[in-house]
């Protein structure tokens, strides 16, 4: 279900690009005057990441994801009905909040369920997002069609922005769009998101107790000594990585046409091969993650991105090198983000606020770096600024990850030593417990033997007293025969084995009857 939700997330995010011209026509604006809707969505995404980071620690995961997807559904249904640019920007901001919560909550839920063993699931989650982003233009093409889109683009380009804005002010805030195909494109994705949200609500009603178990188990996880430093460095790591990824994907077309001298069809193919290898390697990473550690995958990704970006800079006008290096660069960038999230979970626990922190870093990189590169590219059109950015970001991530690894593993070695000490102490305690058990058994056996001895002594005392009473009664008889037999009985009594030394036997005094001679 998480993969299904991220498939819808990819569709929701990517559908805006192919339908941007039609949205501009719907609000009677041209493209240049409507580009700030992306800024509104990005700010909403940042706010949603922060809000989701707090809510995911106090709410049920399924409930939070269901609510965020329901809000996304409402936004998708209302966007085509917006008739003013301001209302469309506000709607995009709310839409960004919902997808920010969904993005943060989905990543945290993967970590909460599978922990540091969730690398394949994390790769599958982000592959679903890439698949949705790949399918969105196809869906827009099927819904809108090339003819309607072309007509809308031409119409929006020739109308002046001022006249369109005055026409927009006279219209209502909401209204049925003139192009029904635009409505269907967003309605299909919105319906899909609604169905997935219903399933999440059902999971919340059915398995609400599992949330507490997952949160209780997460609280017992480890916390690195340099937890805050790791999060800050990971913030920078994702800032450079996501910024370079979005920058190259956004500007490779213009770079290929203006700097490398490619035709538009070839430049479009170069752009497609970047995103195609990106999505394909995210799919293959699901299987690679079962046999490779996340840290290994990050190292391989850094090596691939550094090598390919270096070749891009050195051979920036060679078409063959551009094709090969671009495909390698797209493949190398595919697994870095999900591998980074899975890797950090191996060393320190990632809760909602922590996940929101490095997601914000990725979002800021997505906004800031492309904006700066756009300005620099305009000032220095003869320089391959996009390629320099890719190389610089690869160097930055290549330096940051060893530092991250050093900070993460040093406390872990100490922790392992402490764990070994605790295990030894447990072993000693268990062995001492065994000794105590043996001593208790010995004491019980000794008590049993003592009880048997006491029983024997009591038996001996009883028999001794009975013999004494018998002998006394026999001595009182005034017959010579009994007296003559008594010494032998006395001797038998004195040599009897029942005389155990613990009780002193007194010799009987000799009594003689009158008128008898010995």
Curated annotation (Swiss-Prot):
Entries under Pfam families matching the protein: MFS_1
Keyword Secreted tagged: no
GO biological process: sodium ion transport
Record region (Disordered): 414-448
Membrane-spanning ranges: 19-39, 53-73, 82-102, 107-127, 139-159, 221-241, 307-327, 347-367, 376-396, 400-420, 438-458, 466-486
Annotated signal sequence range: none
Alphabetical list of InterPro entries matching this protein: MFS, MFS_trans_sf
Localisation per UniProt entry: Apical cell membrane
Compositionally biased tracts (Acidic residues): 436-448
Membrane-protein topology: Multi-pass membrane protein
Keyword DNA damage: no
Function: May function as a sodium-dependent glucose transporter. Potential channels for urea in the inner medulla of kidney.
Family label: Belongs to the major facilitator superfamily.
Protein name, as recorded: Sodium-dependent glucose transporter 1
Natural source organism: Homo sapiens (Human)
Name of the gene this protein is made from: MFSD4B
């Amino acid at each position: 279900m998480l993969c299904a939700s991220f498939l819808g997330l990819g569709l929701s995010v990517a559908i805006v690009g192919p339908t941007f011209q039609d949205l501009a026509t719907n609000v009677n604006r041209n493209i240049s005057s409507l580009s700030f809707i992306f800024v509104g969505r990005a700010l909403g995404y940042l706010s949603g990441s922060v809000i989701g980071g707090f809510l995911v620690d106090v709410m049920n995961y399924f409930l939070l994801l269901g609510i965020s997807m329901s809000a996304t559904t409402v936004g998708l249904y209302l966007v085509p009905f917006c008739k003013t640019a301001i209302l469309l920007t506000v709607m995009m901001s709310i839409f960004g909040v919902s997808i920010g919560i969904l993005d943060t909550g989905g990543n945290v839920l993967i970590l909460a369920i599978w922990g540091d063993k969730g690398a394949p699931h994390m790769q599958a989650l982000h592959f679903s997002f890439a698949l949705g982003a790949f399918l969105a233009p196809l869906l827009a093409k099927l819904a809108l069609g090339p003819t309607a889109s072309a007509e809308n683009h031409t119409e929006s380009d020739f109308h002046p922005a001022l006249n369109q804005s005055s026409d927009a002010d006279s219209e209502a805030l909401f209204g049925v769009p003139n192009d029904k195909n635009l409505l269907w494109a967003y309605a299909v994705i919105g319906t899909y998101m609604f169905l997935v949200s219903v399933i999440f609500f059902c999971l919340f009603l059915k398995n609400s107790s599992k949330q507490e178990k997952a949160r209780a188990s997460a609280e017992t996880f480890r916390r690195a000594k340099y937890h805050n430093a790791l999060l800050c460095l990971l913030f920078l790591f994702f800032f450079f990585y996501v910024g370079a990824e979005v920058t190259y994907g956004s500007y490779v077309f213009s770079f290929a046409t203006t700097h490398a001298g490619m035709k538009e069809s070839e430049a479009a193919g170069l752009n497609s091969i970047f995103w195609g290898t990106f999505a394909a390697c995210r799919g293959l990473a699901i299987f690679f993650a079962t046999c490779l550690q996340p840290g290994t995958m990050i190292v391989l990704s850094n090596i691939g991105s550094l090598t390919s970006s270096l070749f891009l800079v050195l051979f920036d006008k060679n078409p063959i090198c551009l094709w090969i290096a671009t495909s390698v660069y797209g493949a190398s960038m595919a697994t870095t983000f999900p591998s980074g999230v899975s890797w950090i979970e191996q060393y320190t626990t990632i809760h909602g606020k922590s996940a929101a922190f490095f997601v914000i870093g990725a979002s800021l990189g997505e906004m800031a770096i492309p904006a700066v590169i756009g300005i620099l590219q305009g000032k220095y059109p003869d320089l391959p600024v996009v390629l320099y950015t890719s190389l610089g970001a690869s160097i930055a991530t290549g330096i940051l990850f060893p530092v991250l690894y050093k900070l993460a593993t040093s406390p872990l070695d100490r922790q392992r030593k402490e764990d070994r000490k605790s295990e030894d102490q447990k072993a000693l305690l268990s062995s001492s417990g065994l000794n105590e058990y043996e001593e208790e058994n010995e004491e019980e056996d000794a008590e049993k033997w003592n009880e048997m001895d006491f029983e024997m002594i009591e038996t001996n005392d009883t028999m001794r007293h009975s013999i004494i009473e018998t002998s006394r009664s026999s001595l009182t008889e005034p017959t010579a025969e009994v007296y003559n037999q008594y010494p032998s009985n006395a001797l038998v009594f004195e040599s009897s084995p029942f005389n155990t030394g613990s009780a002193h036997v007194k010799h009987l005094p000799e009594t003689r009857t009158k008128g008898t001679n010995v």
